[in-house]
Regions:
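Bacterial Sec-dependent N-terminal signal peptides
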Residues: 1-34, 454-457
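Long, intrinsically disordered, low-complexity segments
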Residues: 24, 108-109, 186, 264-299, ...
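An aromatic- and glycine-enriched ligand-binding surface/loop that stacks and positions planar moieties
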Residues: 24-86, 184, 188, 192-193, ...
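Conserved, well-structured interaction surfaces
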Residues: 45-64, 84-157, 173, 177-185, ...
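Short coil/turn linking the two alpha-helices of tandem helical-hairpin repeats
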Residues: 154-156, 161, 202, 222-231, ...
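Flexible, polar/acidic helix-loop-strand segments at domain edges
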Residues: 322-389, 571-578
Length: 578
C-alpha cells in the first residue's frame, strides 16, 4: 500500500469518523474499507442525522481555519501581514512543502469526503423514523459544504480532483486533475442542488436554502467572467442578480452593526448566512474550537497565552482607509489605532484604549476571559468564522449589476452598494466603477480570510488589470513597525518605515519630517511619497505576481504519489448533468 493510498484512507477515515458512518477503530487503516456502514443504526432518528452533520460546521474545517485560511485568504490579498509568522504567504514564497498548504489540502478534502459520506448514508442508510424534512436538510448541507470546499480549492489551486464517491477513491486514489471550468461547474451544480434540498429556515440553526442561493450567486458571478477574455456573460449575470434579490428580500437576514459582527456574543447573528461554528473551550474539545485566537491576539488584550502581536495592516490597506476618512467604524473593528477605545475589551476594568503608535489587527481578537463569559483558552475561542454574510450578497448584486459597463449610475445594484457604505457611516456614491467594487470589498471583508479569493476571480475575469493592481499598486513586502503610525487631525493615517534622506529626515506617507515630527516638506510643497521607489532604493525585494504564482502549488507528498498532479487536467464526467 503506497503512502498516498494511506493518506487517502486517513482522510476518508477521519471524515467518516466525524459523520459517524464507520467505526473509528485504530485498525481501519490496515485494510480497505469493505463498504459496510453502520449508518442503518446510527441514522435511526432525526436527531442522529442532524448530529452527524454538525462536524461539517467545525471539525471538518479545523485545520483550514487553524492557520491556513489566514495566509491564503488575507495575507495573499495584502490585507495585512506579520513579518514573523506566515510571511511567505504575503511574499508569495509558499512552496509545495509549506505546512499550511498541506493542512488546507487535507482539511478541504476532509470536507469533501465527509459530505460524500453523508450523501451516501442519508440516501441509503436511514431508518423509518427519520423524517423527509431532516433527510433533505442533511442532503442539502452535504451538497452545500462540498461546494464551499471546492470553491475554496478552485481559487487556491486552480484545477482540482473532483470526486463524488469515496469508495471509488479508496479503490483508485491516483486520480487526474479536472480543469477550472469544470470545477466551477461542479461547485455551481452543488450549490444549486443544495438550494433545492434546504428549507427556507434551517432546522435547529443549520443552513437554509438562502445560504445556498447566496453562494450560488457568488459562484455564478465568478463564472460569468472566468476565462472569458475580459467580458462577462450577461445571462449568467441576470441569474446572479435574481438570486441576490431573492436572498435580500426573502431570507429574513439583515445588516447589523459592523463592530458587533466580530463579537462572540453575536455569533449566528441576523447577517450570517453560513459560518463555521466553533464550540466553547469550556465544553468543546480540540478540533471544535477556533484556534486562530492565539495567532491573532496579544497580551495587552488577552489573558490566555497568545503570540499574535505582530499582525499589522499593510500600507496598501492604510491607503484604502485614507481614501474615505469617515470609514472609522470598519477601521475600528478591523485594526487597532491610537487612542481608540473598546468598552468590550477588559470590560471589568472600564474597557481598553489602544495606546500604541501602530496598527495591529483587531478582527478575531475577542478580549479577555471576562469579556466572553470565561469561554477562552489557548488556541481556543468560540468566535464563528464567516463563510458568507449578507453584505457579500449586497456587493455581489452591485458587481453583477455593473457587469460589462464602465460605470453603474443607478438601479438596485447601486442601492445595494450604498447600503454597505451607509452601514459603515460613509457617504453614498452617485455612481460606481470596478475599482469602487474592489475598494469596498477589500475594506468590508478585510482580515476575514476571503479577499484573495475574490481577487482570483477578478484575475480570471480581467487578468491584465489585476496583475497591474497586484504588482504596481499594493506595495507588497513593506512591514510597518511599532511607533511608526500616527493619526492626523483630519483622521487620516500617516506612517513611515525606517528610511531617511541625506539630512536624516524621515519619509512619512504624508510629508517629509524631521526626527521631532516637524514638517520639512509637505505634499502642497511638492513632496511625493513614492513608496515603490523607496522600497527599491532601500533593498526591499519586489514581489512579482503572475500566472505562475497566483495559484498555490500542490502539496509535495501528493505530487510524488500522484503523477497526475503534474499533468494537464482532463474533463470531468458529469454523466447526464450536462
Amino acid at each position: 500500500m503506497t503512502k498516498k493510498y494511506i493518506n487517502i484512507l486517513k482522510a476518508f477515515a477521519f471524515a467518516c469518523c466525524l459523520s459517524g458512518t464507520v467505526s473509528c477503530q485504530d485498525d481501519f487503516l490496515e485494510r480497505t474499507p469493505d463498504g459496510k456502514y453502520t449508518g442503518e443504526s446510527f441514522y435511526a432518528s432525526d436527531e442522529a442525522v442532524l448530529k452527524a452533520c454538525e462536524p461539517l460546521y467545525n471539525r471538518a474545517w479545523f485545520n483550514y481555519n487553524r492557520r491556513s485560511m489566514l495566509g491564503l485568504g488575507s495575507l495573499r490579498a495584502n490585507d495585512g501581514w506579520n513579518l514573523y509568522m506566515n510571511a511567505e504567504f504575503a511574499r508569495f514564497q509558499i512552496t509545495a512543502l509549506t505546512g499550511e498548504i498541506m493542512q488546507a489540502w487535507s482539511s478541504l478534502h476532509t470536507v469533501v469526503t465527509m459530505s460524500n459520506a453523508i450523501l451516501h448514508d442519508v440516501s441509503e442508510n436511514t431508518g423509518p423514523d427519520v423524517s423527509i424534512e431532516v433527510k433533505n436538510q442533511a442532503i442539502g448541507e452535504a451538497y452545500l459544504m462540498r461546494g464551499v470546499a471546492y470553491f475554496y480549492m478552485l481559487r487556491i489551486w486552480g484545477p482540482c480532483i473532483l470526486f463524488e464517491n469515496n469508495d471509488e477513491v479508496v479503490l483508485n486514489p491516483t486520480r487526474p486533475l479536472n480543469p477550472e471550468e469544470d470545477v466551477l461547474k461542479f461547485v455551481i451544480r452543488d450549490f444549486r442542488r443544495a438550494s433545492e434540498y434546504l428549507p427556507e429556515k434551517g432546522i435547529n440553526g443549520h443552513a437554509s436554502c438562502y445560504a445556498a442561493k447566496a453562494l450560488l450567486a457568488k459562484a455564478l458571478l465568478a463564472q460569468s467572467g472566468w476565462n472569458k477574455g475580459g467580458t462577462r456573460d450577461e445571462d449568467i449575470l441576470d441569474e446572479c442578480i435574481s438570486l441576490c434579490e431573492e436572498v435580500i428580500d426573502k431570507s429574513g437576514a439583515s445588516l447589523i452593526d459592523y463592530e458587533n459582527l466580530f463579537k462572540y456574543q453575536y455569533n449566528n447573528n441576523e447577517e450570517t448566512l453560513l459560518a463555521m461554528k466553533w464550540a466553547s473551550p469550556v465544553t468543546g474539545s480540540w478540533g471544535e474550537t477556533n484556534a486562530l485566537l492565539s495567532d491573532l491576539s496579544f497580551s495587552d488584550v488577552c489573558d490566555v497565552n497568545c503570540w499574535g502581536g505582530s499582525w499589522v495592516a499593510s500600507a496598501d490597506m492604510i491607503e484604502l482607509y485614507n481614501q474615505e476618512l469617515k470609514d472609522k467604524k470598519r477601521l475600528k473593528a478591523t485594526f487597532f489605532t491610537y487612542d481608540t477605545h473598546y468598552d468590550y475589551i477588559k470590560s471589568a476594568s472600564g474597557g481598553y484604549t489602544y495606546d500604541k503608535k501602530w496598527i495591529q489587527v483587531k478582527k478575531g481578537v475577542v478580549g479577555c476571559k471576562e469579556d466572553v463569559d470565561g469561554q477562552l483558552a489557548v488556541m481556543a475561542s468560540p468566535l464563528n468564522t464567516y463563510i458568507i454574510r449578507l453584505a457579500d450578497v449586497y456587493l455581489t448584486h452591485a458587481e453583477a449589476s455593473l457587469g460589462n459597463q464602465a460605470r453603474l449610475s443607478g438601479g438596485r445594484g447601486l442601492e445595494c452598494f450604498n447600503a454597505i457604505r451607509t452601514r459603515a457611516g460613509i457617504d453614498p456614491k452617485t455612481s460606481i466603477t470596478f475599482e469602487d467594487i474592489i475598494r469596498e470589498r477589500r475594506v468590508e471583508f478585510c482580515m476575514e480570510y476571503c479577499n484573495w479569493y475574490d481577487m482570483v476571480s477578478w484575475y480570471r475575469y480581467r487578468p491584465d488589470f489585476m496583475l497591474d493592481y497586484f504588482n504596481h499598486r499594493q506595495h507588497r513586502n513593506a512591514f510597518i513597525d511599532n511607533n511608526n503610525v500616527e493619526i492626523n487631525p483630519d483622521g487620516s493615517i500617516r506612517y513611515h518605515f525606517w528610511w531617511r534622506d541625506a539630512n536624516e529626515n524621515i519619509y512619512w506617507s504624508d510629508a517629509l519630517r524631521d526626527e521631532d515630527g516637524n514638517v520639512v516638506q509637505s505634499i502642497a510643497d511638492g513632496y511625493v511619497f513614492d513608496l515603490e521607489s523607496l522600497m527599491r532604493e532601500n533593498g526591499v525585494d519586489r514581489i512579482t505576481i503572475n500566472e505562475s504564482n497566483v495559484f498555490a502549488p500542490y502539496p509535495e507528498a501528493d505530487v510524488l504519489q500522484n503523477p497526475y498532479l503534474s499533468m494537464d487536467p482532463v474533463p470531468y464526467d458529469f454523466g447526464n448533468d450536462k
